[in-house]
Amino acid sequence: MVGAGPAALRAAIACADSGTSPLLIDASGVGSASGAHSIAGIAASIDELDSSAHREDTISAGGESTDKISAARVCGEGVATLAELERWGLVLRTREGGLPHAYSAPGHSVDRMTGCGDSTTREVTRILEEQAIKRGIQRWADTYLYGWQ
């Protein structure tokens, strides 16, 4: 995987869990997550019967360029992904009863954003880095791939 942000880390974890030996290559040092952009939160259909409204909001916000199959898959996996991160140690802001606090965000017709406040990106990256370490995923830091576009 090229990069060390949340997407690359999660992809490497999936590879390791399926029996392959992934390698993370990043131009910055370990822990820098140079490719990680700040995120407002994690969207999941936690207060909905299913993810169909989430999928429709995503398709509506993305317009004609939206891959409907990908939108359905990603929106459908939101709750399971959030639960996985919690099992691995992510501490979400919660509401009474212990469920994740959900709030509104542009493009969503209902409250479905959740997270760790301003530290969501940092905390998700930290959790995924811990999981990568537990799996012995090799990392090359301070490495540049010349000619890579």
What kind of feature is each model-predicted range?
Residues 1-24:
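N-terminal Rossmann-like FAD-binding beta1-loop-alpha1 element of flavoenzymes
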Residues 27-149:
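Conserved N-terminal/central alpha/beta ligand/cofactor-binding core
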